[in-house]
Amino acid sequence: MKKKEKPKYSAVSNIIYALKNEWRWAKDKILFDLPRYPIELFTMLAGMYFPKLIIDAITMGQTAWYIAVLVVGYYLILLALRIVSGYTSNRRFRYHYYVPMKYQNRLTMRRFTTDFQNTDDPDINLKYNKADSDASTTSGAANNMYTTLAGIISSILGMASCAAIITVISPWILVTVIIEAAIYYLFSCANMKYARDHADENADVNRRKGYIAGFSSNFEYAKDIKIYGMRGWIDDMFKQFQSESLRLYKNEQTRWCAQRVTGVLLYTVRHGISYLFLTAMLFDGKITPGDFVFMLSAVGNLATDLSRISWSFNTLYDYSRRMGWYREYFDIPERFNHGEGEPIPTRANMPMDIEFKDVSFKYPSADGEKYALKHVNLKIKAGEKLAIVGRNGAGKTTLVKLLCGLYYPSEGGIFLGGTDIEKFNVDEYYSLISAVFQDINIIPLTIAQFVAATDIDEDVDRGRAMKCLELAGLGDKIKELEKGMDSRLMKGIYDDSIDLSGGEKQKLMLARALYKNAGIVVLDEPTAALDPIAENELYLKYNMLTKGTTSPYISHRLASTRFCDRIFYIEDGEIAECGTHDELMAMNGKYAYMYGLQSRYYSENVNVREAEA
């Protein structure tokens, strides 16, 4: 288990932070909460004192009319207070979900806008998951920190009033109640500490359980689950995480159960002692029957307020820790510029030279000194078509993500037209790049909207979108569809949606990259899901599709590299060989060896098919 880190922010700091946000986002909630304190205090004291008045009136032989006036007057006052309380409570409740929604919206927007590398860091993801789990529930700190603090203020007022009343009659009863509350508070502290110490473990188990649940319900995996009989494995994995979750829950609840049992025993002892003291005083004539009821009620309310205060302070401390999660996630540093930076080159000035200077990169989760890329030096000339090849895990995709501004170098720098890309506004820098990555992610838009990367039809240049679809090889498919480019994507979201094949999805991604008309076009295995005919068509059109751009091209099929100006062969995170196809073949090195293996494999396959025919 990881060594627990000390919280970055103190409880007081987090409380002040939460109150400032509450005032900024829901000022009316606080203003309408102010009448609550005098109303609750008066209602409690009146509820204690009114029975004494009635009992004393009866024992003193007052008339029924006098008693009736007392009862009616009391309930009229109570009714008026409850009307005011109900009105202010309803006004407060309007903001019940507003504040946590503000926290969650800000959290989500930060998730969208933070450096991409931050979303790929397990430690940062844990911070986000913890903060999001609190902001997304009405029982978290985001929704209840102010409410808990307000409850403490109300309970302190009640406690002070009851303590003053009890002290006048018998200080020993007050001491008994305080001792009982202190013992209960210690139990509560121990249980809260246990919950805090196991919060990360709980979050990790719930994350794993949630992943398995999401995986099993994802339509994309349904075929694999059925064909490969994965149901049993998924069921076993879910049960394993469920069992671990239940174990943690049982351990926590066992402690709370012990606290509740202790609370009942303490309540019994406290009530017994109070009854003995007050009964003795009643028989000695020191108090009246009305005083007896009044004092017993005061003891009960004092114990309740002390219990609430102790519980609320522990809860407030826990909420403070949770608020710290939120603040710590927002404190994660951004290395790239967001919303500021040097002006980016205009499209008219593109393409431009791109240079990697002694670039090394290590993933945040990597152990020790394990680098994905080591001391990479390369210069991509303006308008050059560059192939990046190598075995799986060599570092090809990592290099491309660095170029795209998704990752930043651990060492060295990347320069566009002589300017370090970290000096640009990264969001503007992204506008210079079109990319087709290995991962295909479709979102529920129309085909036209998806290609134009917008959900507003008026922003779509339909002629341009159709041209890009045709260039990508989807023209005939679009013409076959009843709604053409207005067909919705992703079945399961809309009833009239369509599903595309793997190859068609890859063509759609290519069409989107072409529509953007950026100065840098990154193609990461753009033919992986295409059939041989479609793949060959793409090769033939490659120069036309990337005309006027700088285009890094990643491929496992080395035959495709003939269309590129230069080839970089990467091995173990380093550039092992560099040159044109003919130059690398003449070197008879690693590239030539791999090319020979692939050529022999494809040649043997062709011969086998011809023999079978």
Regions found by a protein language model. Give the residues of each.
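Transmembrane helix-loop-helix hairpins at lipid-water interfaces of multipass membrane proteins
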Residues: 30-84, 162-195, 273-276, 280, ...
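ABC-fold ATPase nucleotide-binding domain signature/coupling loops
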Residues: 128, 370-371, 409, 415, ...
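Membrane-integrated ABC transporters
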Residues: 1-43, 64, 88, 92, ...
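Extended non-transmembrane interhelical loops and adjacent amphipathic helices
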Residues: 1-16, 97-143, 205-251, 319-333, ...
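Helix-to-loop junction immediately C-terminal to a conserved catalytic motif
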Residues: 404
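C-terminal portion of ABC ATPase nucleotide-binding domains
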Residues: 484, 540, 548, 556-557, ...
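Cytosolic ends of transmembrane helices, especially the final helix of ABC transmembrane type-1 domains
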Residues: 230, 273-274, 295-332
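ABC ATPase nucleotide-binding domain helical subdomain, centered on the C-loop/LSGGQ "ABC signature"
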Residues: 415, 430, 448-495, 539-540, ...
